[in-house]
Amino acid sequence: LPGTVGTITRDDLIKFHQAQWKPGSSALVFVGDVTLTEATAIAKQYFGSWSGGAAPAFTVPPPQPVGPGKVYLVDRQSAAQTVIAHILPAPPRASPEYAAVTLADAVYAGGGFGTRLNLNLREDKGYSYGVFSNASLLRQAGAIIASGGVQTDKTTESAAEFMTELKNLAGAKPITDPELTAARLTKIRGYSQQFESLNRVAVQVVGLWALGLPMIELQREPESLLGASLAAVNAAAAKYAAPAGATLLLVGDRSKIEAGLRQLNAGEVVLLDVEGRPVK
């Protein structure tokens, strides 16, 4: 936020750099036609004098749910459409539920155009050009985030369909074998594309290092996606996709969509400005 950035001084940046940029908390990744011996020599040549150990350990507090029944509305006057998003808490990347959550999300909206939410809003109702989601499972916590732009005059109906599809995923309409098979194929085929270039390989390695996971996870990823059972995927969906745990965020023309959102009865409507500050 501007109010926060404005208080940061040059001395603050220097202190942060000195405290956090430490060799013991860093990784140097080489990908290409280079041997370990050559890479080690290069690292010593350019970073051999870098000393200082590791950065101070710190603990990030677990995320606290905002509570059910929250709908945040950001007013953008004369907006051509409304962007709808929701966020649901999810487990960290190291969780044994990782594959099941990933596949449940792929059925919901994270697996391309043939997913439930996208088929509903794009193909069936024509309210949107596309709605997608992503299961972002990080080191200490995760989230399932879905978003998409919809017609302004169909904002209320679209928001209702977001919640309906979450309810369906959480158990009202369990995931089927064909849906799970399609989700597996999408994720496994997409995973292979993450190794199409040297840069992409480096990104995968750095990502695992940042998550505190062993490099063997590069091999285990497709195996875990293949091994997750239908029962496990439906259990993960029931646990993490319940609409009561979702926080809705809408960005659009308040004058055209607020009344409908309040009639939706999805929860308290909280007005925010474009910087995320509450509007009275």
Per-region residue spans from a language model:
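M16 family metallopeptidases and their MPP-like homologs
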Residues: 1-3, 23-31, 81-92, 101, ...
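Peptidyl-prolyl cis-trans isomerase
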Residues: 8-10
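Conserved, carboxylate-rich catalytic/transport cores that coordinate ions
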Residues: 17
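An aromatic/glycine/proline-enriched structural segment found at the starts
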Residues: 22, 27-94, 252-280
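Hydrophobic side chains in well-ordered alpha-helices
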Residues: 39, 117, 158, 236, ...
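Secretory-pathway/luminal and periplasmic proteins that interact with or process carbohydrate-rich
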Residues: 51-56, 114, 192-196
